[in-house]
């Protein structure tokens, strides 16, 4: 039951068109511990949606839920996390997930913080499970898997259980809310580097500013021709947080990345099992060029962000070489055969 004191905090926030980050932390913290009735959660989410999410809304909510979350027992220094908002409706193969595996095979430290499918046929957890990559590891075993392979998957509900307090309301509302952009910001490892794909480009600049507020050293927010990843079917909008704190924005095409343009229909996938088959085909050299290139340009951004490449184009070329010479296929074969649950 919402207390009078908590209700007063909520009302002040609902009446404030320009809240501060600190005020947002204050209003979202009761939600993380179940102090709001569902009707008050709905009022908060609907108000923010109606007036439009602000930098303070997103940064403050992220800080509140990170404070309530369970951290992963690995320092974030040198670690990269990558996730997208989803919701683009494209139902592509799991491009960002595949790119994460390429990056790990290439020596980057990658944490994939994600969930099962919400708006598509296959979420990151669905395809990784079909690739025999462990999902249900406790923190100690997940750390062991990470140290052995440079990669681990952190199942979002296990590390951010406070999100569950808002789930009934989100399901009942059946409209996008601030939580649709919040999830990727809540990485339990507090990574130094992060790439986030957004389905709605209007969030690009704001989310890059949020990454700066959350202490990321470098970050990329991308929107690729209607999808929440770097596109090989069209032009990608990029917002880049540089190491000195400057934020720049630009566009990049498949041709500038050094790959052929394709149609979005060439990238349509299926469920987790089908997308895992596509992933293996990419890595063993039997898959379509469009699939390989889509994974490579997104992995290339990871190499660029971690200063392993001087440009997105150079990063793409490096990712393609790792796929073409069998490095990624060998990496996957090695680590799917080891049982990290014991």
Curated annotation (Swiss-Prot):
Top-level enzyme category: transferase
Cellular component aspect of the GO annotation: cytosol
Binding positions (Mg(2+) 1): 96, 229
Details of cofactor binding: Binds 2 magnesium ions per monomer.
Key words of the record: Amino-acid biosynthesis, Aromatic amino acid biosynthesis, Glycosyltransferase, Magnesium, Metal-binding, Transferase, Tryptophan biosynthesis
Binding annotation for 5-phospho-alpha-D-ribose 1-diphosphate: 84, 87-88, 92, 94-97, 112-120, 124
Any one Pfam family match given in the protein's UniProt record, by short name: Glycos_trans_3N
Annotated binding of anthranilate 2, by residue: 170
Recorded catalytic activity of this chain's protein: N-(5-phospho-beta-D-ribosyl)anthranilate + diphosphate = 5-phospho-alpha-D-ribose 1-diphosphate + anthranilate
GO biological process: L-tryptophan biosynthetic process
Source organism superkingdom: Bacteria
Binding residues for Mg(2+) 2: 228-229
Transcription regulation in keyword set: no
Enzyme Commission code: 2.4.2.18
Residues where anthranilate 1 binds: 84, 115
Needed co-factor(s): Mg(2+)
Any GO molecular function: magnesium ion binding
Involved pathway(s): Amino-acid biosynthesis; L-tryptophan biosynthesis; L-tryptophan from chorismate: step 2/5
HAMAP family on file: TrpD
Database matches in NCBIfam families: trpD
Purpose: Catalyzes the transfer of the phosphoribosyl group of 5-phosphorylribose-1-pyrophosphate (PRPP) to anthranilate to yield N-(5'-phosphoribosyl)-anthranilate (PRA).
Subunit annotation: Homodimer.
Protein name in the entry: Anthranilate phosphoribosyltransferase
């Amino acid at each position: 039951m919402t207390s009078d004191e908590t209700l007063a905090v909520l009302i002040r926030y609902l009446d404030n068109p320009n809240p501060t980050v600190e005020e947002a932390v204050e209003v979202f913290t009761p939600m993380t511990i179940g102090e709001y009735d569902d009707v008050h959660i709905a009022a908060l989410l609907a108000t923010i949606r109606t007036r439009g999410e602000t930098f303070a809304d997103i940064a403050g909510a992220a800080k509140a839920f990170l404070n309530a979350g369970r951290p992963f027992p690995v320092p974030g220094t040198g670690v990269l996390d990558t996730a997208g908002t989803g919701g683009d409706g494209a139902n592509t193969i799991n491009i960002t997930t595949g790119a994460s595996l390429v990056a790990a095979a290439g020596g980057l430290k990658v944490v994939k913080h994600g969930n099962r499918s919400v708006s598509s046929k296959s979420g990151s957890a669905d395809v990784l499970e079909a690739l025999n990559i462990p999902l249900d590891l406790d923190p100690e075993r997940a750390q062991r898997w990470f140290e052995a392979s440079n990669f681990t998957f952190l199942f979002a509900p296990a590390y951010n259980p406070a999100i569950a307090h808002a789930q009934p309301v989100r399901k009942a509302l059946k409209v996008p809310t601030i939580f649709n952009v919040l999830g990727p910001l809540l990485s339990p490892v507090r990574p130094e580097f992060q790439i986030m794909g957004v389905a709605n480009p209007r969030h690009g600049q704001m989310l890059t500013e949020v990454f700066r507020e959350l202490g990321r050293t470098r970050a990329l927010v991308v929107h690729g021709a209607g999808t929440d990843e770097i596109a090989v079917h069209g032009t990608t909008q990029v917002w880049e947080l540089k190491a000195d704190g400057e934020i720049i924005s630009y566009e990049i095409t498949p041709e500038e990345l050094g790959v052929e343009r394709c149609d979005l229909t060439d990238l349509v996938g299926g469920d987790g099992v089908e997308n895992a088959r596509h992933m293996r085909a990419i890595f063993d050299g039997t898959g379509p060029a469009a699939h390989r290139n889509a994974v490579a340009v997104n992995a290339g951004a990871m190499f660029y962000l971690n200063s392993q490449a001087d440009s997105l184009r150079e990063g793409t070329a490096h990712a393609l070489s790792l796929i073409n010479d069998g490095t990624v296929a060998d990496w996957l074969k090695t680590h799917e055969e080891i049982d990290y649950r014991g």
